[in-house]
UniProtKB/Swiss-Prot annotation:
Serine/threonine-protein kinase which, in association with cyclin D-like protein cyd-1, is required for the progression through the G1 phase of the cell cycle during postembryonic development by phosphorylating and inhibiting lin-35 and fzr-1. In complex with cyd-1, involved in sex determination during gonadogenesis by regulating the asymmetric division of the somatic gonadal precursor cell (SGP). It holds the Pfam family Pkinase. GO terms for cellular component: cyclin D1-CDK4 complex; cyclin-dependent protein kinase holoenzyme complex; cytoplasm; nucleus. The keyword Phosphoprotein does not apply. It is an enzyme of class 2 (transferase). The gene is cdk-4. The lineage of its organism: Eukaryota, Metazoa, Ecdysozoa, Nematoda, Chromadorea. This is Cyclin-dependent kinase 4 homolog. Interacts with cyd-1; the interaction is likely involved in regulating cdk-4 activity. Residues 102-388 form the Protein kinase domain. Its cofactor is Mg(2+).
Amino acid sequence: MTIRHILAIRKKSLELPSDLKTFLRVLANCQHLKKNKKCRRTIFSVDFQNNQRQKPSNFHFWTVIKKFSKKILKSFIIKFGNNGTIAVVFSIFPTGATPSLTFLFQALGKGAYGNVYRVRSLHDGKDYALKQIMISSKNEGIPQSVLREITVMKHLARKAHPNIISLKSVFHQLDPVRAILKINMIMERCDWDLHTFLRNIPRGVPEQQAKHVTAQIVRALDFLHTHSIIHRDLKPQNILLNRDQTVKLADFGLSKEYSNTTAFTTLVVTLWYRSPEVLLQSYYNSTVDMWALGCIVSEIYCRQPLFVGQNEAEQLTDIFKKMGTPVGKDWPSESVIARDSFPQYRPTNLKDLSPQMSKQAIEFVQQCLRYDHSKRLSARGALSHPFLKPAVATKSRVLKQINFNK
């Protein structure tokens, strides 16, 4: 077995022997690093390459690592690659830091800038989600959405709302060979996102469960809007769900703080859940989240998107065909697109579009999908709507019948 490594200690490099036991002994003798408060973080980036056909014993590996490094390591991240490669990253913090060893073992999904992995802490034995953002030196700095997400999630973590995903830790790694900066965010891990859940259940969602899920989304939105934050990218993929039916909002890369006098015109929100004022490039506010919520509630019942378009023009046309073309004051005066650019469509009964929905659910969705955003249902108002008033936490047969591979 050979070892390739990078050991950065206050801009000094140190050659480590190629023997794993000797390496761990050196690591165990690094206790003195903790006493040096100037050395805030020491990064070990180690690749263990197994040149033999038989891979090393994972159980033995974890036992040795935990024994030798538990007291001096803050974070421990590992990834199994091809051909027996094991990539490990260690971070050492000064005295007083709580040791937490984490290893990475399952990919959960991909994003615009990186991947999401399932990780397990060797400190508390719990599973978390690791969002790893890869930034090349060719890029012009760190993307604004990444900085925004970290800022918002750190802000929200201090308030700890039960329906908003909690950020546990943020740290970075530098890969000098590939000239890549990795920003790692360790967050709560949930069992599914709403998109996956709806497409894997054997039958429709019961009314009581639909109310319970919707109520939790609304509570999270009310919390965000109360703290002057618009999510701006609400969609089923960003709504996480646990087996106990706990719902948590995630992915705040497009979220933005606002005030009562702030008006935005930037195009945001995944196409199918964009409100008309956003598609028409007009001014918008926090009610864009409520439009997206109306689309999502319909999708919970029907298990398919309410409005589907391949581009902005198609999306608007589909909305107008189903909801009717807006007239008079319903058409935004600041819109860059003229009203006569679209034919006059008559509205379709929402019951015909979503026959699975109850009368109260239809009324709720209709109030979320009003063209005039000043008349649209607010998150606070939604909590007192008759559709959500009786919502209570109940165990659902649907969740019990689903066999997901975790």
